[in-house]
Regions:
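Short, solvent-exposed positions on alpha-helices
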Residues: 152-153
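Conserved hydrophobic residue
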Residues: 148-149
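Polar/charged low-complexity regulatory segments
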Residues: 1-128, 135, 142, 161-253
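Short, hydrophobic/aromatic alpha-helical segments in well-folded domains
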Residues: 139-140, 157
């Protein structure tokens, strides 16, 4: 039986969960709610929610959201490098065990399995870093248990790794949606002026779309029928070649 060429299809979905073995990693997942004189600490869960929001805003052609994705991407690269350095130090310590002693995986008998809902690639990259930290914590606890490192070294490595992730997660706490798109900026309308007053000026490569994060989403721009369509950002030369004196259309119909 022949299938119709344009058979209706639903959205693709997959079920994902993250398995954590240490309290150190679980605390970084949840973060901390503000209480009394203690300020709140954003965990991975809150970080992912903010990154999903920024990713969605960037897809709507918001140049300020694109600037945030670049900042987050740079911070992720730095965090990854710092965790790799800690992992290298730990690996050196574990090699001090005699060849006759086989050290197996240090796994929790009842690990925590957390459902994962991530809609942005940068959220996944942060999740991978938390999984790496969980492994680092497990192996460091094993190294201390087998006298390959002392307790102060264990605490220092655990805290250094946790600080790297907390610094990453806290980066997005101040994000606010600007409510503008590149057409607003080009038109110099009231929305653009308000955004500039609140969030400042942006570098030209971000404004013209030539500088975007590696995992930036395709842009959705209003089509002739008022519906958002994915469209590449033109480069600066194309913009100059097609310049006209017509008014720039707004972002939304």
């Amino acid at each position: 039986m022949a299938l119709p060429t344009h058979a209706p299809l639903g959205s693709l979905r997959s079920q994902m969960q993250l398995t954590l073995h240490t309290h150190h990693a679980i605390r970084l997942w949840h973060g901390r709610l503000p209480s009394g004189h203690l300020h709140g600490i954003l965990g991975l869960n809150g970080f992912v929610a903010q990154v999903n929001r920024i990713h969605r805003d960037a897809a709507q052609d918001d140049p300020y959201a694109d600037a945030w994705l670049l900042r987050i991407e740079a911070k992720l690269d730095t965090a990854r490098a710092e965790l790799l350095d800690l992992r290298a130090q730990l690996s050196d310590a574990l090699t001090q065990a005699p060849a006759a002693l086989q050290l197996g995986d240090n796994l929790n008998l009842a690990p925590v399995q957390l459902p994962v809902t991530v809609n942005a690639p940068l959220g996944f990259l942060a999740l991978y870093l938390l999984a790496d930290y969980d492994e680092l914590a497990r192996r460091a606890l094993l190294a201390q248990h087998t006298a390959l490192i002392d307790p102060p070294t264990l605490e220092r490595w655990l805290e250094d790794g946790a600080h790297v992730l907390r610094s990453l997660f806290s980066l997005v706490q101040t994000y606010r949606t600007s409510g503008v798109c590149r057409n607003d900026i080009a038109a110099g309308n009231a929305k653009a002026l308000h955004a500039r007053e609140q969030f400042g000026e942006l570098p030209q490569p971000i404004l013209d779309g030539s500088q975007r994060a590696r995992h930036a989403p395709p842009l959705r721009r209003p089509g002739p029928n008022g519906q958002g369509n994915a469209a590449p950002v033109p480069n600066a030369t194309e913009v100059l070649d097609k310049a006209t004196t017509e008014p720039v259309p707004p972002c939304t119909p």
